[in-house]
Amino acid sequence: MSLRRPAKDQPETFEFNSSSLEAANIVVSKYPKGKQQSAVMALLYIAQRQNNNWIPLAAMKYIAKFLEMPYIKVYEVATFYTMYNLSPVGNFFVQVCTTTPCMIRGANKLVEACKEKISQHESELLGDKSCSWMEVECLGACVNAPMMQINDEYFEDLDKEKTLEILDKILSGETPKPGSYRGRVNNEPENNRKTLMDLKNA
């Protein structure tokens, strides 16, 4: 397991804005009285979305107070799960899956594209601090390998050229279309076979 440390530069304060507070209260209301600490993961995610895709220490302290639980417990959860970013990742956070199915299908080319367009090293912000990238474990879209996730969207069936095009779009302020880049609908077969009924016995 990799060592995960919070960013050195931290904001002094954090609090939920009105929409985040509403979302947090809805989540907490789903738990019995005295069990609201179970909402910690959801509230960390809400805080991350509000704070430009990362969670500062001030947010962890705020959530601890909000849920009436020890700060160290919130810190333990936030630093354990890699879905929580402990330092700034920019407006566009690119996650490239490099688990076996994606790697077999050419994920290394997607990594090359990220190094060319964003930075040579993982978790290193682009010069204007708008974007960063990192390799991640399985994102659950193996049938559409290789693929990457940008913020909340999946981009699938990629190669280096298509990845460069997508990165060019986000860096120029455009919104690329998520989904398959081989024209597939969801995870249909690449050769468009819809049935096995016409296959002859071996």
For the regions a protein language model found, what residue spans apply to each?
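Signature of N-terminal electron-transfer/Fe-S-associated modules in redox systems
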Residues: 1-202
